[in-house]
Amino acid sequence: MQAVPYTIEEMVREAKSAFDAGAAIIHVHVRWDDGTPTQDKERFRVIMDAIREACPGVILIPSTGGATGMTPEERLQPTELFPEMATLDCGTCNFGDDIFVNDMPTMRAFGKRMLENNIKPEYECFEIGHL
Protein backbone atom coordinates (compact mmCIF):
# COMPACT_ATOMS: atom_id res chain seq x y z
CA MET A 1 0.00 0.00 0.00
CA GLN A 2 1.22 3.52 -0.80
CA ALA A 3 1.95 5.88 2.12
CA VAL A 4 -0.43 8.59 0.86
CA PRO A 5 -4.18 7.87 0.96
CA TYR A 6 -5.85 8.16 -2.46
CA THR A 7 -9.30 6.61 -2.24
CA ILE A 8 -12.21 7.88 -0.19
CA GLU A 9 -11.96 4.85 2.07
CA GLU A 10 -8.22 5.38 2.62
CA MET A 11 -8.75 9.08 3.35
CA VAL A 12 -11.45 8.35 5.93
CA ARG A 13 -9.42 5.56 7.54
CA GLU A 14 -6.36 7.80 7.96
CA ALA A 15 -8.43 10.74 9.21
CA LYS A 16 -10.22 8.50 11.73
CA SER A 17 -6.90 7.13 12.95
CA ALA A 18 -5.62 10.67 13.57
CA PHE A 19 -8.93 11.70 15.16
CA ASP A 20 -8.91 8.68 17.47
CA ALA A 21 -5.35 9.61 18.50
CA GLY A 22 -6.57 13.08 19.51
CA ALA A 23 -6.43 15.23 16.38
CA ALA A 24 -8.99 18.05 16.38
CA ILE A 25 -7.97 19.45 12.97
CA ILE A 26 -7.32 17.49 9.79
CA HIS A 27 -5.62 19.00 6.74
CA VAL A 28 -7.07 17.50 3.56
CA HIS A 29 -5.40 17.02 0.16
CA VAL A 30 -7.66 15.24 -2.31
CA ARG A 31 -6.68 12.85 -5.08
CA TRP A 32 -8.42 10.65 -7.58
CA ASP A 33 -8.22 6.92 -6.88
CA ASP A 34 -5.14 6.66 -9.14
CA GLY A 35 -3.28 9.22 -7.01
CA THR A 36 -3.63 12.21 -9.33
CA PRO A 37 -4.08 15.43 -7.30
CA THR A 38 -7.40 17.20 -7.83
CA GLN A 39 -9.20 20.27 -6.57
CA ASP A 40 -12.54 18.98 -7.83
CA LYS A 41 -15.19 20.45 -5.55
CA GLU A 42 -17.43 17.38 -5.65
CA ARG A 43 -14.55 15.04 -4.79
CA PHE A 44 -13.69 17.31 -1.85
CA ARG A 45 -17.36 17.34 -0.79
CA VAL A 46 -17.65 13.55 -0.75
CA ILE A 47 -14.39 13.09 1.17
CA MET A 48 -15.04 15.88 3.66
CA ASP A 49 -18.60 14.66 4.34
CA ALA A 50 -17.31 11.12 4.91
CA ILE A 51 -14.59 12.35 7.27
CA ARG A 52 -17.07 14.49 9.22
CA GLU A 53 -19.36 11.48 9.60
CA ALA A 54 -16.51 9.33 10.93
CA CYS A 55 -14.99 12.13 13.06
CA PRO A 56 -17.77 14.22 14.65
CA GLY A 57 -16.69 17.75 15.51
CA VAL A 58 -13.40 17.63 13.62
CA ILE A 59 -12.25 20.81 11.85
CA LEU A 60 -11.22 20.19 8.25
CA ILE A 61 -8.69 22.32 6.41
CA PRO A 62 -8.91 21.67 2.68
CA SER A 63 -5.81 22.49 0.69
CA THR A 64 -6.02 25.30 -1.84
CA GLY A 65 -2.56 24.39 -3.11
CA GLY A 66 -3.72 21.83 -5.61
CA ALA A 67 -0.83 21.00 -7.89
CA THR A 68 1.63 23.06 -9.90
CA GLY A 69 0.02 24.26 -13.10
CA MET A 70 -3.51 24.56 -11.69
CA THR A 71 -5.21 27.92 -12.07
CA PRO A 72 -6.18 29.96 -9.00
CA GLU A 73 -9.84 29.28 -9.84
CA GLU A 74 -9.22 25.52 -9.81
CA ARG A 75 -7.30 25.77 -6.57
CA LEU A 76 -10.09 27.75 -4.85
CA GLN A 77 -12.83 25.17 -5.54
CA PRO A 78 -12.79 23.71 -2.00
CA THR A 79 -13.64 27.15 -0.57
CA GLU A 80 -17.01 26.89 -2.35
CA LEU A 81 -17.88 24.29 0.31
CA PHE A 82 -17.47 26.95 3.05
CA PRO A 83 -15.10 25.04 5.33
CA GLU A 84 -14.16 26.55 8.70
CA MET A 85 -10.55 26.88 7.54
CA ALA A 86 -8.51 26.54 4.33
CA THR A 87 -4.88 26.92 3.36
CA LEU A 88 -3.46 30.21 2.14
CA ASP A 89 -0.01 29.78 0.58
CA CYS A 90 2.24 32.74 1.40
CA GLY A 91 4.48 32.98 -1.63
CA THR A 92 5.93 31.43 -4.74
CA CYS A 93 8.45 28.63 -4.31
CA ASN A 94 10.21 25.85 -6.15
CA PHE A 95 8.37 22.55 -5.90
CA GLY A 96 10.55 19.80 -7.29
CA ASP A 97 11.35 20.81 -10.86
CA ASP A 98 8.30 23.09 -11.03
CA ILE A 99 7.42 26.55 -9.75
CA PHE A 100 4.46 26.82 -7.38
CA VAL A 101 3.11 30.28 -8.22
CA ASN A 102 1.55 32.35 -5.46
CA ASP A 103 2.01 35.94 -6.57
CA MET A 104 0.49 38.90 -4.74
CA PRO A 105 -2.69 39.07 -6.87
CA THR A 106 -3.29 35.35 -6.24
CA MET A 107 -2.69 35.65 -2.50
CA ARG A 108 -5.00 38.68 -2.30
CA ALA A 109 -7.75 36.84 -4.21
CA PHE A 110 -7.46 33.82 -1.91
CA GLY A 111 -7.49 36.02 1.19
CA LYS A 112 -10.49 37.99 -0.10
CA ARG A 113 -12.45 34.80 -0.82
CA MET A 114 -11.72 33.51 2.66
CA LEU A 115 -12.62 36.80 4.34
CA GLU A 116 -15.90 37.10 2.42
CA ASN A 117 -16.89 33.55 3.38
CA ASN A 118 -15.71 33.58 7.01
CA ILE A 119 -13.05 30.94 6.27
CA LYS A 120 -10.07 31.18 8.62
CA PRO A 121 -6.76 30.87 6.75
CA GLU A 122 -4.04 28.43 7.67
CA TYR A 123 -0.99 30.35 6.46
CA GLU A 124 1.46 28.07 4.68
CA CYS A 125 5.03 29.35 4.71
CA PHE A 126 7.36 27.14 2.69
CA GLU A 127 10.53 29.16 3.23
CA ILE A 128 11.83 32.03 5.37
CA GLY A 129 10.89 34.66 2.78
CA HIS A 130 7.24 33.82 3.30
CA LEU A 131 7.24 35.11 6.87
Task: Indicate residue ranges for each PLM-predicted region.
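Catalytic alpha/beta core domains of metabolic enzymes, predominantly
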Residues: M85-L131
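Hydrophobic faces of well-ordered beta-strands that scaffold small-molecule active sites
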Residues: I26-V28, V58-T64, E84-L88, P121-E124
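Conserved, mostly hydrophobic/aromatic
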Residues: M11, A18, H29, A86
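Non-catalytic positions within long, well-ordered alpha-helices that form the structural scaffold/packing
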Residues: F19-D20, T79, L115
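Alpha-helix-loop-beta-strand connector modules within alpha/beta enzyme cores
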Residues: P37-P62, A109-E116
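Active-site-proximal loop/turn and secondary-structure-junction residues that shape catalytic pockets
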Residues: V30-D34, T64-T68, C90-N94, E127-G129
